[in-house]
Every structure is written in structure tokens, then in C-alpha cells.
Amino acid sequence: MDKLLDRFFNYVSFDTQAKANVKSVPSTQGQRKLAQALQQELLTLGFSHVTLSDHGCVMATLPANVSWPVPTIGFIAHLDTSPDFSGKNVNPQIVENYRGGDIALGIGDEVLSPVMFPVLHQLLGHTLITTDGKTLLGADDKAGIAEIITAMVRLKHRNVPHGDIRIAFTPDEEVGKGAQFFNVAEFDAQWAYTVDGGGIGELEFENFNAASVAIKIVGNNVHPGSAKGVMVNALSLATRYHQELPVDETPECTEGYDGFYHLQSIKGTVERAEMHYIVRDFNRDSFEARKKNMVDIAKRVGKGLHRDCYIEIVIDDSYYNMREQIIKHPHIIELAQQAMLDCDITPIMKPIRGGTDGAQLSFKGLPCPNIFTGGYNYHGKHEFITLEGMEKAVAVIMRISELTAKRAKEL
């Protein structure tokens, strides 16, 4: 079996499911166990400057093998899997030379069907790695880890010219904390790529601007039989608030570069209600306008209330569109595009309707677009990846490294 697959199967055997609303990083012990295993593997493979931080971030260096100065670049993947679905006792299935039709996932009724997932029609003849229908696969992002390490080993063994390359494996990306304790100064790269995308050719450097919005509504409860002019129903105010937002600017009505408002939770009584929203937009001005709109609605709905009744709104920015940072360094994208073309891959540029560690790192001074892993249907039992896609990702990582060295020699 290919060493790339060996590595991947080893990593998915670790249960690294992240846990939301946990203060510690990493949020689960399984992530630390995988980090320790990777630290040991990297030392055994002869990497230099191998470190493991208190927060479970592994870093290492593949030293340059050329005599001329080359910018230090980096490749980053994450240790954790989604909190949305179990990552315990992952049992991958290999489907060689896929011939079309449904793929049975383990023993039972679960199938991976081209009717539900038409991308399978494009993968005839490929080797697919699927789940057994009971867990997610963990290609997001253990495929990225396997691809990065395999690419580094091949660069070294094949003596492909390259500068210093830094690699890092981070915890808790799935719960938004991956970049929180990432030491950019210690990583010491001029730019990097997260290997955390989907199908072959994906190259992403645009993501949402993101904010979370918490709304607290305090009403006044009295006996409904004598409530006229006295009762203030917090639930009614919550309903009025939500109805003020545009009905067609929600996740289920938007795509591409559209932004949205998303009500994630609502709970309450007559006396008190709480609402939690997220706000997303690619354009910074539109993003700011959305947040202002939410404040303005709170003012309108809360106007004229008794002084003991009120609407309180707290808005926290989560992350911003990394495009603002990356367009200042166009060669980072150009190198990745050229690397893909050199590997007979058509780059697919599309916005990320979400966020990545790279978005936060880009604003910490480490420009960091995202490249593909070769995986599909993340965060659930229908997750799968192709061996061909994984090999292509390895080839692109190697080619980016080589082109960076060539570019430095020519400058």
C-alpha cells in the first residue's frame, strides 16, 4: 500500500473530534495524542526544529537544499475533526477502480450514491476511500497532514531544489480556535498555504467577513388577565426583531458572493429572551452595513419600552476576508496557480463561504491561502477522498516548493 495512504490511515485512527464551548486548547485529548505521534514521526524522519507547543501545535522544518537565498514558505493542516459527527473508530473502505453506481458503506443500508453526490460521475476509474457509514472519515484534515509530510519526504529523497520549508499542524480549527495560539513569529515563514480544501484544483483566497451577534431582550411578565398596558412580552419583541431582517438574505437563500444573516438559536419566556445570530459578507463595507442594520433594528423595536425593559445587542467580529491581505502579495496565488498547471490541474478559484485558519493567520502577518486535499462531503458519514486527489495535492505542494526556489534564483 502507498506510504501516503499508510500515513492517512494511521492518522484517522486517532479520535480527534473537537469540542465546542471548551476553554482549553486543544479541546480534546485525542488531538494532543495525534500531535505527540506526529512530533515523534517528524523527528524519526529527520526534520529539524521539531516543536510541540503547550496548546498542541506541531511545527517542523525541512531545511533548504540550495545555496541561494529563498523565502521560507509554510504548509499548514489541522489535527481536529468536526464536532458535528463522530470521529471515533474510523474504519476506512478502499474502492479501487470505481465503476459507477452506489457504494455500500459498511454493513447496512448506508450508501454513497451518485444521485445524491453527482461529483462521483467525474471519478470513474479512481480509487475512493470512504467511511463505513458509522463515522466521518477525517480527510478534513488528516489528508492534508498526510499530503504535507509525504510531499516533504519526497522533496528530500528526490533532491528537488527548495528553500527552507516550515510545516505546522494545528488544533481546534473546526471550532474556530486553530489560529488563536499559533505563534507566527516562531513559525517564521514569509507566506504559507493551508492544505484544507476540497476537490482537485481548489485554490481559495477569499472568505467571509464574520461576526457573532448576541441579543438579550428583557420584558415584563404579569398575569395575562390584567396585562393590558403593563405586560411586555420578550418573545413578541424577539419575533418582531427577526421579522425586520430581509427574508431572502439567509444561508438557505444565498450562494456565491452573497452575504447573509443567520439566526442560530432563540430561547426565552415572556420575561426574557435571547437570540444568537451570525453575520457574513465578503465585502467589508456591506459587512459593516449588516452589523449597523442589526443595531438599528434593536433601536426601532426597543423604542418606547418601559425603562426596566430593554434590548441589548453585543456584536463580536470573528474573522475577516483574507483577500485584503493576500492581494498585496499576488505572487503567492500565482505560484500556486502555476504549480497546479504544471501538474495538469485546472485551478478552480472560488470564495470560501466560511473561514479558515488561514484567514486569521493572514491578518496576523502570515498570508495564507487554501489549497485542495482531494476530499468531498466533509463533516459526515458520506465523506470520501480519492487517492488520485491526494497524490495531486502532494505533487502541487512539491511544485510550489520548487517554483519558490526557482523564482528566488531568477529575481
UniProtKB/Swiss-Prot annotation:
First-tier enzyme category under EC: hydrolase
EC id: 3.4.11.4
MF-aspect GO terms: metallopeptidase activity; tripeptide aminopeptidase activity; zinc ion binding
Entry's localization field: Cytoplasm
Binding residues for Zn(2+) 2: D140, E174, H379
Xref: HAMAP family: Aminopeptidase_M20
Task of the protein: Cleaves the N-terminal amino acid of tripeptides.
Protein's name according to its UniProt entry: Peptidase T
Organism: Yersinia pseudotuberculosis serotype O:1b (strain IP 31758)
Gene: pepT
